[in-house]
Amino acid sequence: MDSFSKLSGIQHDVFISFRGTDTRHGFLSHLRKELRQKQIDAYVDDRPESGDQISPALLRAIKESLISLIIFSKDYASSKWCLEELVQIIECMEKQKQIVIPVFYNTDPSNVRHQKGSYGDALSNHGECYEERVPIWRSALKEAANLSGFHSSNYE
């Protein structure tokens, strides 16, 4: 990261949004290693989810990143935190022109786009407690899934 980026409010090259149970010890660890070797500063929240609200520091990290990389995995939508991160990422894409890159890791992009399979199940389960947030999450999932990205089945 160069000094110009720091002056312009950018603190991280990449913010990575992921569901830890699906990706932390495999795909994500390999990705982080490769990014470090290329001296790319990636913000990865390693703390376990706790509480109802995402921390202000995490929301700030999203806003202060040049790129957001969303790793959509089978259980991504089961996490309220992941969905709230996604909403913030989409807002940054629209307002700050942040670059957003979706990666579909062991999940089909159409399941994310149309909220089928595990995505549909997760949103149905969330509807019981977060009825007012589910339409916002659905919209963010659809918008992100329509972006150009990478599908892991293309690289196996």
PLM regions: where:
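Cross-kingdom TIR/SEFIR domain
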Residues: K33-K38, I54-E156
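Conserved N-terminal substructure of TIR/SEFIR domains
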Residues: M1-I67
